[in-house]
Amino acid sequence: MEIVISAIIGLLIGGTVVFVIKRLQDNNKKKSARFEAERIVNKANSEAAKIKKESENKAKDFESRARKNVEQDIHKQKSTLKNKESQLERRLKEVEDQFKQKMEENERYLNSLKDREEKIAISENRIKDLEKKGEAHIGELKQKLESVAAMSQDEARRQLLTALEDEAKQEAAKKIAQIEEEANKESEKKAKRILATALSRFASEYTSERTVSVLALPNDEMKGKIIGREGRNIRTLEAHCGVDLIVDDTPEAVVISGFDPVRRELARRTIEKLMEDGRVHPARIEEVAEKQRNELMKSMKEEGERHVMELGIPNMHPELVKIIGGLKYRSYQGQNALNQSLEVATIAGLLAAELGVSVKLARRAGLLHNIGKAIDHTVEGSYAFVGAEAAKKYNESEDVCHAIRAHDEEEKPHSILAWIVHAAYTLSSSRPGARRPQMDTFIHRLEDLESIGNSFDGVLKTLALQAGKDIRVLVESSRVTDDQAVMLSRDIARKIEREMPQAGQVKVTVVRETRSVEHAR
C-alpha cells in the first residue's frame, strides 16, 4: 500500500514537475516568439525607414533634375525670345530707315514741287507784267496812231503787227534760252545720278597681271623627270605648250613663264597630269599635252556657259559661249578680258535699268563687246570689228553688233544701247587700278614676234620666250632642209630688225626635227 501511495505521490510529483516544465517551456516559447516578433517588427521598421529615406532621396533627385530641366527650358526660351527681340529690333530699324528714306524722298519731292510752284508763280507774274506792258504798249501805239492819222488803216495795222511780232520773238528767244539752260542742268544732274547709282551698286577688284606661274612638285626626283635625259623632256614640253620652263635651285618647284595665259594653263595641266601618271618621256608628253588642250577647250566652254547663265542671257550661240569662256585666258592692258566683259555687262545692265532700257539686251551687248580679243590674232582688223563680225555670224541682232563696234568709238554710237555699252566700257576702263598699259604693250610685242616667224613658209609654230629675247621656230622637216633652216633663221632675224627695230637683241632658233614612226604587227 505504501508502495502504491508512493507511486501515486511520485506520479503526482512527476506530473507536477512535467506540468511545471511544460509550462516553463510554453512561457519560453512565448517569450522567444515575442522577441522574434519584436525583431521582425524592428527589421520591418528599419527597412521601412530605409525605403522611406531612399524614396525621399529619389524624390529630391527627381525634383533637382526637374528643376534643372525647367531652368534650361526657361533659359532656352529666354534666348529664343532675346533672338526674336533682336530680330524685331533689326527689322524695326530697317523699317525706320526705310521710312526715313521715304520721308527724305518725299521732302525732296515736296521741295521740288515748291520750286516748281515758285517758278510757276514767277512765270505767272511775268505773264501779268507782260500783259501790262502789252496793254501799255498798245496804248502807246493807239496814241501814235492817233497822232499819225495821216496813215492808212492797212499801214497802221502792219506797223502794229510788226512791232508785236518783234517783241514776241524777243520774249520767245529769252524763254527758249532759259528752257535750254534748265534742261541742260537737269540732264547733267540726272546723268550724274544714274552713273553714281550704277557705280554704287557695283564694285570690282584691282587688276594685276603676271606672266609666270609657279608649280609645286612633290619632290626633286620629279624635277629630274621633267628635265629628262639631256633636257629632251623639257624641250618637248616647251615646244608643245609654247612656254618657257625655268628649272633652278628652288626646291620642289618649277616656273612656267609665258605671255599667253592659255599656254601657261596648258603647261600647268600637262605637268600635273604627268606627275600623277609618273611616266615622263617625249611621246607621253605629246599625248598628254594634246589631251589637256582638248580638256582646256571644254573647260573654256563650261566657263562661258556659267557666266551666261549667271547674267540671265538667253539663246546665245554655243560658239559665242565658247569664245566668252576663252576670254578668261586673255588680257588687255593688264586687265583680264573675261572679268572686264562681266564688269561691263553688269554696269550696262545697271545703266539700262536706270534708263528704262532692256537690261538683258544691255548685258548681252556688254558681255559680247570684248569677244574680238579671244579670236585668233591672225584675223585682220581691230578687235571691235572682228568681234562684231563674229556676233553677226552667230545671229546676233544689228543693235548688239553696232554696240560692239561702237564701244571704243571706232564707230560713232547712234543708238541708246550703243551709248550704254560705251559708257559702261569707259567706266570700267577708267576706274583706278583697272589697267596697266605697259603690260599690254609687252604682250603685243611678243605677239608681233610670233607673227613674223609664222609668216615664213614651212613654219609650223613660233614661240616667243625669255620675255621676247628668244624665239623658237618649229619647221616641217619635209619642207625645210638643214641648210634652209640656217637661211631661215637669218631671214627671220633680218625681218625683225626691219619691222621691230626697238626689239633689241633677239635670239632666233630654228628647230627642225625628223621623226620616223613604224608599228610592229
Swiss-Prot record:
The residue ranges of the KH domain are: 211-271
EC numbers, comma separated: 3.1.-.-
Q: Which GO terms describe its biological process?
A: mRNA catabolic process
Gene3D superfamilies attached here? Hypothetical protein af1432 (1.10.3210.10), K Homology domain, type 1 (3.30.1370.10)
Which portions of the sequence form the region Disordered?
51-87
What's one GO-annotated cellular component? plasma membrane
Membrane topology, as annotated, equals:
Single-pass membrane protein
Ranges for domain HD come to: 337-430
| CDD domains from the UniProt entry | KH-I_RNaseY (cd22431), TM_EGFR-like (cd12087)
Protein purpose: Endoribonuclease that initiates mRNA decay.
Q: Which family does it belong to?
A: Belongs to the RNase Y family.
Under what name is this protein listed? Ribonuclease Y 1
Q: Report which gene this protein is encoded by.
A: rny1
